[in-house]
Amino acid sequence: MKLALALSLIASVAAAPTATLANGDTITGLNAIINEAFLGIPFAEPPVGNLRFKDPVPYRGSLNGQSFTAYGPSCMQQNPEGTYEENLPKVALDLVMQSKVFQAVLPNSEDCLTINVVRPPGTKAGANLPVMLWIFGGGFEIGSPTIFPPAQMVSKSVLMGKPIIHVAVNYRLASFGFLAGPDIKAEGSSNAGLKDQRLGMQWVADNIAGFGGDPSKVTIFGESAGSMSVLCHLLWNGGDNTYKGKPLFRAGIMQSGAMVPSDPVDGTYGTQIYDTLVASTGCSSASNKLACLRGLSTQALLDATNDTPGFLSYTSLRLSYLPRPDGANITDDMYKLVRDGKYASVPVIIGDQNDEGFLFGLSSLNTTTEADAEAYLRKSFIHATDADITALKAAYPSDVTQGSPFDTGILNALTPQLKRINAVLGDLTFTLSRRYFLNHYTGGPKYSFLSKQLSGLPILGTFHANDIVWQHFLLGSGSVIYNNAFIAFATDLDPNTAGLSVQWPKSTSSSQAGDNLMQISALGLYTGKDNFRTAGYNALFADPSHFFV
């Protein structure tokens, strides 16, 4: 009798989990003991052939009886080896190419639009758990849901007594997902990668109840390009986040990234990149250049894509491929939309790492003199006026004690200009654009954070993307914020229900008195004021459009 009972329990534990989709299809997942995972579920038709570059089409096939126990392929990646320039040290390139990030995204394919659902063990339909939908980062050029599995977050949610379901959506990257130019705009195919994400959200709205999730309690969150994507979805259709009459999400978390400082989809630089692709693929003489690009093999298009600048090329964050205003879904420049209140009104968390710019400044190591620095700024920001450059240089002087990594004095200055360039890039794209968003956003409760957890780390400081390592693998004060507080926010719309060691204050305008910023250090959590580098803020955001790319 005891043996039979034991065998029955073992069989129960080992039984593959199931879920029933909205159309009645029943699918099987993976019992990973600490969680149950449904991996690589297609949510869109393969975006190949005539569907390349176009809006995603909802998946039409039957999934009934199929098993989803392994991640689907990553979307096509812009090869970093093709985007680096000679001034980046080869040792750095080798380290990046051998890193977990770039190894994890292989294999890849154009047929990549899948979604992953991970839930606590034993979760059934009707559990109505909050849902956290993850959008990965990677400069809109690289990345995959496979890089950072959500096991730690899901397990922590159970231990906290606030169980959540974690969903991760794949989306097209680089030229495959963010091609720009007049032809793309005329066809209505702009920002395909964002539309992939949006369709993934709609899939969640339709199907997550069958996994035990509550479609009315979805929090979207992401890091870097994923964080900027979250902001794009706040601005989508002028702030309309409804689907079938109900909100697609009720809250957003942004880790390193807010408004994308980008020109329109038919602007100068996006068109230049499009023309470069067309020319390098032999499509210049075609009567329909987009049709010609669609007729290329995957490898031919990828090779041409790899010949365009990437996020670690000389001008770095002047990205070749990124979300752009299109007059349709992103109806205007993102800074203006935020100023005008054209956003979904939901509670938000937004924050940064103290030294966001180092990773992107690394490719400017040959910028060593004052003249070099000015040339770099003018090449990076083609709309900047002489007055803009003068103000920027004054706000970010060549004094290495004022550069990034911040608060390190004369240390970490690999070149006389590197810490200066790091500071400009980090503040424009991440740290101070966060403040701009907070100063203008009135759509709901807002919380902000700044991490200085690695301030003693030589050269790097508290570098961009270190948070996702704490979030997925490590313990410490960073993990408390990126897991416990985020889980509490997704569950209760208040990070303080996580029982933090200090109360996380709501964010206010930087001009107001009082602490309004959660700060993360190696020793723990504390609060502070979001009022640093005001000269830099004024130089960068007197007219943000002067620094669009």
Curated annotation (Swiss-Prot):
Residues 1-15 form the signal peptide. Gene3D superfamilies: alpha/beta hydrolase (3.40.50.1820). Disulfide bonds join 75-112, 283-292. Pfam families: COesterase. Glycans are attached at residues 329, 366. One of its GO terms (biological process) is lipid catabolic process. SUPFAM superfamilies: alpha/beta-Hydrolases. Keywords: Disulfide bond, Glycoprotein, Hydrolase, Lipid degradation, Lipid metabolism, Signal. The keyword Hydrolase applies. Its EC number is 3.1.1.3. InterPro entries: AB_hydrolase_fold (IPR029058), CarbesteraseB (IPR002018), Carboxylesterase_B_AS (IPR019826), Carboxylesterase_B_CS (IPR019819), Type-B_Carboxylest/Lipase (IPR050309). The active site is at residues 224, 356, 464. It is an enzyme of class 3 (hydrolase). GO terms for molecular function: triacylglycerol lipase activity. It catalyses: a triacylglycerol + H2O = a diacylglycerol + a fatty acid + H(+). The keyword Glycoprotein applies. It comes from the Eukaryota. PANTHER family: CARBOXYLESTERASE (PTHR11559). Belongs to the type-B carboxylesterase/lipase family. This is Lipase 5.
